[in-house]
Each structure stands twice: as C-alpha cells, then as structure tokens.
Amino acid sequence: MICKNSIRHKELTLIIFLCFIYLSKTFVEVKAPPYVLVPEGSDINLTCFIKDDQGAGEDKVIVAWQQGDGEVTQGIKTTWDTTRQVGQTMLHISKVSKEAEGSYMCVVWINGDADYKKMNLGVFTVSKKTYMHNEVSITPRRSRVDMSDGRPLKIECAFSTRRIYGRSQVNIKWWKIDGITRKWEQQTSGVNLLLHTYGGIGSLSIPNPTTGESTGKYMCVVTCGDIGNVGFRLVKSLSPLSDTESDHSYTSEEGSHFMERCKVKKSPYGGWIVE
C-alpha cells in the first residue's frame, strides 16, 4: 500500500522539535544508513525503514523529507504493511549529480508519535583512478572473475577497517555498468555481507549466470559509518576450451603425460583456500 506525502514545512519543523522532546516515549522507530555513497549519473533511492506497534493504518502514516534546510516534495514513495506494522519511505533521485551531495533527513509521524533519521549522500565520479583514501580498504581493488554459463557465480569484495564498526554502520551495494547506456545500475538481488572484527566480505551471488547478461564490469561500494570505498570486478566468460566438465572429471591415455592444476589463494581470515 502506498501512502501520500502530505505535510507542510511548519508541521515538519514541529515534528522535528517534538522528536527531541518525546524520543524516549515514541512507538515509531526509523532506521537508515548514516552514509550513502553512489556513482555519479546513476538512479538512486534513499531509504528509511519504519517500524511501529500501534496498529496504525496507512492513513495514519505521514512522511516528510528534507535536503539540507529545504523540504523535498517530489520523488517520495512510502509503503506500509498494516498487518506487520513495518514499511519504508524512499526518496528517488534520477541521474544523481555532485549537486545532490549533502545531508538528508526523513521524518515519520504516526498517531502523534514521531521519529527521524539523517543520512549523508556522497557522489563520486567513476574512473580508472577512482579510490577513496581513508580507513576502509578493499583488496584487491581491481580483479577479474571467471564465470561459466549456468554455474552459480559469486563475486566478492573483501575489505578491512582500522577500527570496529557495528552491523548497522556497515553497508555494501553492488553496481553493474550497462554496456549500451554506460550507466551504472544497482544490483539488489543476491547481496550478502559477512563481518568480522576489522572488516568483512561483501558478495553478489548470481545463481544462473549467462554470457552477455552476467559478464561485464561490476563495482562494490562499502560504507562504514561516514566513510567508504569502492572496488571493481570484471566478470568474463570462460571459453569452451578453458572450461572444465560439469562433473569436474578428467580423462587421460595410459602412458601419456598428465598434469592437474589447482588454484590456491590466501583467506582474509587467515590460512589458505584451495579451489
């Protein structure tokens, strides 16, 4: 169900004021990532997740967005599940530019109770030299990933940090460049994040990859608190000659020379992985 955004600027100011006074009494809970880092020219959705326990219907959900000190009235879509008492509000920005950078805030008002969240939007230009010099490090920054049609594919970005971040502070988003429009498109299915003390691994799983649709240039964007970094993965299809049999079996003739090869790489958690 979709809720309408109907709130005036003075009402928005009042809601924010009441949030500071009654924050400890509120039933409404709003969550959002503190920092969102996106490639320039892409289409994005800034999202706030809503939770309530008052049994409110969709008509009781009032939402407002601010960019800096100004109210935003376009591109807002709010959904609400009356049964589960959860929902989300999204602010859609098309072809995001550097001018869109800055502070955003969503405010949610339900049956007299309110909550809000602020987030910062960062926009970067993608180039061969794209790299943020901060305490989030993605290794390797660039690498090639081989795939075979029909075989499950997992693309990974291992990252490390100089300090410990909570689960709510760490996010990973995956993007793939469109070969025709040259526009970065966000990948939302198959995204997973595994954390350890000082970093983790973000992955993108494609259960049934195909040459053309799944091959190409991917980008992982990892944010920790108010900083982030990017890594690039080039997915290429193995040729029939370099591909192996589906059952991973090999045959040889008696008396002939035979050599078998395996790939060994270091695990980010210590030790070694044999593929």
UniProtKB/Swiss-Prot annotation:
Q: Output the GO biological process annotations, alphabetical, semicolon-separated.
A: B cell receptor signaling pathway
Q: Which Pfam families match?
A: ig
Could you tell me the keywords of this UniProt record? Immunoglobulin domain, Repeat
| Protein name, per record | Putative Ig-like V-type domain-containing protein FPV055
Quote the PANTHER family the UniProt record gives. B-CELL ANTIGEN RECEPTOR COMPLEX-ASSOCIATED PROTEIN
User: What is the scientific name of the source organism?
Assistant: Fowlpox virus (strain NVSL) (FPV)
Ig-like V-type domain residues: 25-122, 140-239
Q: Cite the InterPro entries for this sequence.
A: Ig-like_dom, Ig-like_dom_sf, Ig-like_fold, Ig_sub, Immunoglobulin_dom
According to the UniProt record, one GO cellular component term is: B cell receptor complex
